Amino acid sequence: MQVILLDKVANLGSLGDQVNVKAGYARNFLVPMGKAVPATKKNVEFFEARRADLEAKLAETLSAAEARAVKINELATVTIASKAGDEGKLFGSIGTRDIADAVTAAGVAVTKSEVRLPNGVLRTLGDHEVHFQVHSDVFAQLNVVVVAE
């Protein structure tokens, strides 16, 4: 199925590219998420007329994401208190939702889907490096300190 991309899609293309994808991928993900439209003659003409607007909107979201990434990097560290045993192991774990809530409480709005844990959930006390993907091209990094309650 031929589609016109309205946004940058990983491993597929960027704004304005006409790509051939499987019909299910287009119907179930790309079109409902607003990332693509079917490449009909009418849609191609409509897209060419709105190309400048879409490029400006894409640049605006990219600059907003870069600003959020700078704010996350400026935080440097976030401290999370959790119950732990004598050897420094946590009772339970700290996942993406807990980290997103802590960063949001510190002043930068972050969703749990933007949190990337390279080594899985946090199960020990101490310093842990956490990555954030605030946009498909923009990444940020933060140090999370887990302390015992």
From Swiss-Prot:
GO terms for biological process: translation. Pfam families: Ribosomal_L9_C, Ribosomal_L9_N. One of its GO terms (cellular component) is ribosome. GO terms for molecular function: rRNA binding; structural constituent of ribosome. PROSITE patterns: RIBOSOMAL_L9. InterPro entries: Ribosomal_bL9, Ribosomal_bL9/RNase_H1_N, Ribosomal_bL9_bac/chp, Ribosomal_bL9_C, Ribosomal_bL9_C_sf, Ribosomal_bL9_N, Ribosomal_bL9_N_sf. Gene3D superfamilies: Ribosomal protein L9, C-terminal domain (3.10.430.100), Ribosomal protein L9, N-terminal domain (3.40.5.10). It comes from the Bacteria. Keywords: Ribonucleoprotein, Ribosomal protein, RNA-binding, rRNA-binding. Binds to the 23S rRNA. Belongs to the bacterial ribosomal protein bL9 family. This is Large ribosomal subunit protein bL9. It comes from Edwardsiella ictaluri (strain 93-146). The gene is rplI.
